[in-house]
């Protein structure tokens, strides 16, 4: 599967599950199970319930996703940026 086929979405973490998995509610209301991407795991980026995240999903399985970015209020890309 090529990277062009991935769907990028925004959501918020509603529950922290065992084994580095998270229950995420997307902005459109859909819920799915997501895991942290490789670089986030490598650099020990901590994700807590209530955090806003960006994630990638495969168009073939919309019940799973990979968290690629944790948004902090006032920093990073997105509408909440102060730049």
From Swiss-Prot:
Record's subcellular location: Cytoplasm
Predominant localisation class: cytoplasm
Keyword set includes Ribosomal protein: no
Annotated InterPro entries: NA-bd_OB-fold, RNA-binding_domain_S1_IF1, TIF_IF1
Keywords attached to this entry: Cytoplasm, Initiation factor, Protein biosynthesis, RNA-binding, rRNA-binding
UniProt record similarity statement: Belongs to the IF-1 family.
This protein's name: Translation initiation factor IF-1
Gene assigned in the entry: infA
